[in-house]
């Protein structure tokens, strides 16, 4: 699911806030004492959730990816990050750093692994089989591999992508197919799911935080999470694609947005590339859209955005 995982992680974070495990305006360093220096001690969890923590790009030495699941190592590396601006000054999508930060904050605050929390509090009570951060080693061969297709991206977009994600498409995609990544716990990108289960998770959100008798979030919590905190404007980390944000959730819009046109009430998250999970309460719509092709400059890539628009056109506003 790549970054569409962030919709699921955002749900977990707001659930934990609602339960009093931590507050959005708590400082990150109150949970991760190594997250200081270069002004980072002023960073709050809200700054991280809203992509305004000032660390959209991984700075410093390249991390050892073989140690992705090593919390001590992750906290050490996060402590070395140098913000490019003070916390809260601006919003730039944190594609790489968001997941490790959230994982370690949740672990430090609760004493539990975020994968376990997601499973025991949401997925297991609702009978999900395939969804979580990574899969068991025995299930790796069942995961559909991703493929780079089409022409290379235009140079400016390719450069922005490489800066935001730490590599080119031809580097990222093979790594994401590896057993090492597919069994990792990276709340920003390593979630594996199916279209059915993804849309069912979106249905939790569409129904205001409850599904089949399992209450995940109160309606007022979800309303606060989807309240606009960043108006629609281009983001340099997404190739200047216009983005509108709540607290962790991407928000839809009328003309431009991640969920097609005329989707002002929609919220969720997209993933690299042509993957999306969103809920649109105004249409009674919950969507999980998955694909394995990463089309770059392929002439057929426009079919994805056309599909989003078609969904909204076919499902009338309620």
List where the protein language model places each region:
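Short, structured beta-strand/loop micro-motifs enriched in basic residues and often containing a Trp
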Residues: 268
